[in-house]
Amino acid sequence: MDLKVGQKINLTSGGAVTIIKELGRGGQGIVYLVDLNGEKKALKWYLKSPDDKFYKNLQQNVINGAPSEAFLWPEYLTERQFGSCGYIMKLRPTNYFEFSNFLLAKKTFASYTAMLAAAMKICNGFMMLHRFGYSYQDLNDGNFFIDPKTGDVLICDNDNVMPQGEKSGIMGKARYMAPEIVAGGVPDKYSDRFSLTVILFMLFYANHPFEGAKTVACPCMTESFEKKFYGSEAVFIYDTGDNSNRPDRKSVV
């Protein structure tokens, strides 16, 4: 259910936040601007109440704290109420923009130095995450906010982070999954690294490493075709031994 302006949401640590306004929504939930003891924060509120395993893992992540300052990490967990729950995190500063804006050329980096800095920041963030014993599991182009002037990066949507070897239950996007995960495998830090290479390729080339002539010729990208093009029959667009999926102007992001 949608929350109302002025509504109070109780936290497991005590106290409550007050809803100010909606900031945005997606497939999993709604993000609200909230007031926490006079400080502005963001609340992610789930459209569907998660199961106990997910909720307890989220609670543990709040206790453990963020692997680094690059993560917009869950800071507080709400009680289960009004048919669902959510968590509190820091707000994204206004000078940071979604990665998709860079892919669509709505935003551009101020310099190559800034672009390289963004790549290094993303790699460092996930290195720290893995050092803490976590796997991200749902790495995609919607997980990053970037400052185009400096290349500084903030990593969001960290509620799906799980201990290495465990599965969050959140299905990622096939375009960013390792082929074995598309086929039904369990995500881990190694599949995270595959997804990371896809992100870096897209950052530098503004195109997907598996999207060339084959995907352009696809009449409709159904789930079965996704499993084929990103899983069982994935072909790198610059594969030296297979030119069947070379870059196509229509396939550029």
Write out the residue ranges for each language-model feature.
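Conserved C-lobe activation region of Hanks-type protein kinase-like domains
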Residues: L200-R249
